[in-house]
Amino acid sequence: MVLVAEDDQEMRSLLCDELYDLGVSIREAADGDEALRSVLDARPSLILTDLRMPAGGLDYIARLRTFAPGVPMVLITSFGDPRTKADALAIGVEAYFDKPVRLSELKGAVRRLLGSALDGEID
């Protein structure tokens, strides 16, 4: 299962549609608090999350990392800069994308991070 955390409904729907094409199951969250509750409820195989959303930010990313150690994390943001990227990578984000994100690159990162899990059903 891939957790998609994005406050913009249109963007979240687009991301989910693209990930469905990879054959993964999806759980959605509209803000950081909902994403954290989701991680506590069911450990995802990967987390794809926006940075700037209600209850978001780098502190939220650090909390996600605490509650989901070892789970690959992909970060997307409209408000990126080199320092934010460096800080995110330092706290354990495996892939970082500025919006507008190139969907082919995003899907490539998801494939790479999920690896062999894409060959079978992802829970």
Regions found by a protein language model. Give the residues of each.
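The short loop immediately C-terminal to the conserved phospho-acceptor aspartate in CheY-like receiver
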Residues: 47, 51-54, 79
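Short amphipathic alpha-helix used as the core "switch/output" element in two-component signaling
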Residues: 37, 58-70
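C-terminal output helix
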Residues: 83, 101-114
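The C-terminal output helix
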Residues: 111-123
